[in-house]
C-alpha cells in the first residue's frame, strides 16, 4: 500500500504543478474573463472550463467524441490487423522485408498533408478517408515492433525447435509470436495514441460529414470560444489515454503472468 502511494505521488505532484503553471500563464496574459467584454480569452483558467461545459456545448462535444472514437477504433483495428500481418510476412522472408521496408519508411516520413489531396481525389472527403489517414499514421509502429519482436528471438530457441523437426508454422505459432508479443503490445500502445491523432487530423482536412473533435476544435477557434476549444482538446487527450491504458491492461492480461517486463 505504501509503495503504491509513493508511486502515485510523482504523477500527482506533476499534475498539480501543471495546474499551477496553467493558472500563472492564464492570468499573466491579462485575459479579460468577462463574457460581457466581447474580447476573446487567449487561455482560460482551469475553473473556467467547468463553467463553459454546459448545455449545447456539452452535447456537441459528446457527439463529436463518439464520431472521433469510431474513427480511431476503426483505424486502429485495421492498423493492428494489417500491421501484424505485414510484420509477420516480412519476418518470414527477407525478400518481402527488402521489398516493403523502404516503402513503409517513405509512408511514415511523408507529411500527411501531401497525401490528402490525392486521397480526396481517389476516395472523397468521407469517413473512409478519415480512417485511411488514421491507418497511415498508426500502422508503422505495429509493423516495426512485430518485425523486431520476431527477429529478436534467440537463435538457440530456433535450434531447439528445429531439432524437433517443427514446421515454420509451428515455430511461428509456438515460439516467435509468443516471444514477440511484448514488442507487439508496445507497438499497439504507441499506435493507439497515433490513431487518435489520425482521427483528429482527418477532421482538419476532411470537412464533409459528421464533425469529429478536430472539426469542433476548428469551429470553437474560429468563433473565439477558447474554453470549449480547450475542453474539446482535453477530451481528445482523454481518448488517447483511454486507448493507451486499455492496451496496457490487455498486455498484463495476456502476457503479464509469464513475461518479466510486465510481471515484475
Which role does the model predict for each range below?
Residues 1-28:
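N-terminal signal-anchor/first transmembrane alpha helix
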Residues 132-136, 169-202, 247:
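Transmembrane alpha-helices
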Residues 104-141, 148-149:
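Generic hydrophobic transmembrane alpha-helix motif, especially the helices
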Residues 134, 187-238:
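Non-cytoplasmic
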Amino acid at each position: 500500500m505504501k509503495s503504491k502511494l509513493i508511486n502515485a505521488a510523482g504523477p500527482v505532484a506533476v499534475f498539480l504543478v501543471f495546474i499551477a503553471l496553467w493558472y500563472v500563464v492564464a492570468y499573466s496574459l491579462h485575459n479579460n474573463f468577462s463574457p460581457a467584454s466581447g474580447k476573446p480569452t487567449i487561455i482560460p483558467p482551469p475553473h473556467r472550463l467547468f463553467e463553459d461545459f454546459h448545455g449545447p456545448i456539452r452535447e456537441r462535444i459528446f457527439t463529436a467524441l463518439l464520431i472521433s472514437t469510431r474513427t480511431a477504433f476503426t483505424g486502429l483495428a485495421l492498423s493492428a490487423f494489417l500491421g501484424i500481418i505485414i510484420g509477420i510476412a516480412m519476418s518470414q522472408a527477407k525478400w518481402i522485408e527488402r521489398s516493403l521496408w523502404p516503402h513503409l519508411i517513405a509512408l511514415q516520413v511523408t507529411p500527411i498533408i501531401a497525401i490528402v489531396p490525392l486521397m480526396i481525389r481517389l476516395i472523397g472527403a468521407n469517413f473512409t478517408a478519415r480512417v485511411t489517414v488514421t491507418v497511415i499514421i498508426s500502422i508503422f509502429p505495429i509493423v516495426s515492433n512485430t518485425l523486431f519482436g520476431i527477429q529478436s528471438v534467440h537463435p538457440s530457441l530456433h535450434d531447439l525447435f528445429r531439432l524437433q523437426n517443427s514446421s515454420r508454422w509451428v515455430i511461428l505459432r509456438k515460439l516467435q509470436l509468443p516471444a514477440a508479443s511484448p514488442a507487439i503490445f508496445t507497438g499497439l500502445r504507441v499506435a493507439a495514441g497515433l490513431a487518435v491523432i489520425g482521427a483528429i487530423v482527418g477532421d482538419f482536412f476532411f470537412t464533409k460529414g459528421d464533425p469529429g473533435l478536430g472539426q469542433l476544435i476548428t469551429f470553437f477557434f474560429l468563433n473565439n470560444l477558447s474554453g470549449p476549444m480547450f475542453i474539446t482538446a482535453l477530451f481528445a487527450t482523454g481518448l488517447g489515454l483511454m486507448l493507451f491504458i486499455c492496451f496496457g491492461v490487455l498486455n498484463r492480461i495476456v502476457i503479464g503472468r509469464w513475461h518479466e517486463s510486465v510481471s515484475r
